[in-house]
């Protein structure tokens, strides 16, 4: 493994590059060809909402000197992994109850495995991508690449001093393309960078690194700017149906194609700006970063799924689902979605939680993350109103005498707790005065 990362361009060898068609990868591909490598371009179709023509990207790669260029359709796998994350609640980052749905880590898990698998088919065993040394993706792609191909070598132009010296900035890269006969016009540089896939979009860096810069500078690509009062957003009632943990219907329409299901969920949630959040998070290397996120479809499914979870499962099961979800979310974020410890956690939730989740949830969506749940229907509900009805009911499951017995049994642990508080008070750990929060204990 010591020579896994190549710091210099491997001359005369096949080098696979994850090619987006943007300035960085275009310049890198042309530069590698001119310097003597044999570049192969691989583009992942992840259903990116900001990409208009996927088929044009491989053609562009060929023009820049790729020996071969392939478009890999990753959408179905990405949708399935998104559903798995919903089933497991694999989300560990939230602020004020608003969740980040780990959409970029899910995209990297799919891209990192499927592109490297495609490279193996072409006998390409060296891989490069555009991730920087300060971010999470460099480690995610490293892990997923080596899991897929243990013989893989990693070459990144952005870690090559020669490439940095010659083409170290956007201006230098654009001039390089122009000098080689390509009519490249630099796009207007935004105040932040955006990365997206079918599950969600990430906006970060540049102006967004300043915490005094709010969400309002972001132009959403998956929905509306719900904070803009000039944007008309009408309340909308939506019904989501799950069968054995899998979303299958939206507003009574059944979707056999999981990709189309997600696209429709994105359209519905996007009309309201549902699923947008502003998060400060810990990167893999423990430094904090800030991101603005969109995930309208994931948010819609998550809300409906968790409503059914709370109506169907008991308290201990829900607790384990949430604890395991936090752990699994962090593993996913770290690029460990297919590691044994993650598979163990996934198995428990996908088998013992998700399989019971069948039913429909009706919601009213308003602006942003403002919504109401209007109805919850499932043949598996353990919620039964008559069990705890405040009205008099026939054949009640328990009566006052039963509750007296249950409360009497509590005397055992109340007595133990009282004794422990006395011990702590005598040890000086608690103050049992008249103004103390701890109840006055009196004599033992």
Swiss-Prot record:
Disulfide bonds: none
Biological process, per Gene Ontology: argininosuccinate metabolic process; L-arginine biosynthetic process; urea cycle
Catalytic function, reaction form: L-citrulline + L-aspartate + ATP = 2-(N(omega)-L-arginino)succinate + AMP + diphosphate + H(+)
Gene Ontology cellular component annotations, sorted alphabetically: cytoplasm
GO molecular function: argininosuccinate synthase activity; ATP binding; protein homodimerization activity
Subcellular location: Cytoplasm
Assembly information from the UniProt record: Homotetramer.
Protein name as it appears in the record: Argininosuccinate synthase
Organism: Mannheimia succiniciproducens (strain KCTC 0769BP / MBEL55E)
Gene name linked to the record: argG
């Amino acid at each position: 493994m010591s020579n896994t990362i190549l710091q210099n361009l491997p001359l005369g060898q096949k080098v696979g590059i994850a090619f987006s068609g943007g300035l960085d990868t275009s310049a890198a591909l042309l530069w590698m060809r001119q310097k003597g490598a044999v570049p192969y371009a691989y583009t992942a179709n992840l259903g990116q909402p900001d990409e208009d023509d996927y088929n044009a990207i491989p053609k562009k790669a060929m023009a820049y000197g790729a020996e071969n260029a392939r478009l890999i359709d990753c959408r179905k796998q990405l949708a399935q992994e998104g559903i798995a994350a919903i089933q497991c609640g694999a989300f560990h980052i939230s602020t004020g109850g608003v969740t980040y749905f780990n959409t970029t880590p899910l995209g990297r898990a799919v891209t990192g495995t499927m592109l490297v698998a495609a490279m193996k088919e072409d006998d390409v065993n060296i891989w490069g991508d555009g991730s920087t040394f300060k971010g999470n993706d460099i480690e995610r792609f490293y892990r997923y690449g080596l899991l897929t191909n243990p013989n893989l070598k990693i070459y990144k132009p952005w870690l090559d001093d020669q490439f940095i010296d010659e083409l170290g900035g956007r201006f230098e890269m654009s001039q390089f393309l122009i000098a080689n006969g390509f009519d490249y016009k630099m796009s207007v540089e935004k105040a932040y960078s955006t990365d997206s896939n079918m599950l969600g979009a990430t906006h970060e860096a540049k102006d967004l690194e300043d915490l005094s810069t709010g969400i309002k500078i972001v132009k959403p690509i998956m929905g509306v700017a719900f904070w803009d009062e000039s944007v008309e957003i009408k309340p909308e009632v939506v019904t989501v149906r799950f069968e054995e943990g899998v979303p299958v219907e939206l507003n009574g329409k059944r979707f056999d194609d999981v990709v189309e299901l997600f696209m429709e969920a994105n359209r519905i949630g996007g009309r309201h700006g549902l699923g947008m959040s502003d998060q400060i998070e810990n990167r893999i290397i423990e430094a904090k970063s800030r991101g603005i996120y969109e995930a309208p479809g994931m948010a819609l499914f998550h809300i409906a799924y968790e409503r059914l979870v709370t109506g169907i499962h008991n308290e201990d099961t829900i607790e384990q689902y949430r604890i395991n979800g936090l752990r699994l979310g962090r593993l996913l974020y770290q690029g460990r979605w297919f590691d044994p410890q993650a598979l163990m956690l996934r198995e428990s939730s996908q088998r013992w939680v998700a399989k019971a989740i069948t039913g429909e949830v009706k919601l009213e969506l308003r602006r942003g993350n403002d919504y109401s749940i209007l109805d919850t229907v499932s043949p598996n509900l353990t919620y039964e109103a008559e069990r705890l009805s405040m009205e008099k009911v026939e054949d009640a499951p328990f009566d006052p005498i039963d509750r007296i017995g249950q409360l009497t049994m509590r005397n055992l642990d109340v007595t133990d707790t009282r004794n422990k508080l006395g011990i702590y008070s005598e040890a000086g750990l608690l103050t049992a005065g008249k103004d103390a929060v701890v109840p006055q204990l009196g004599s033992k």
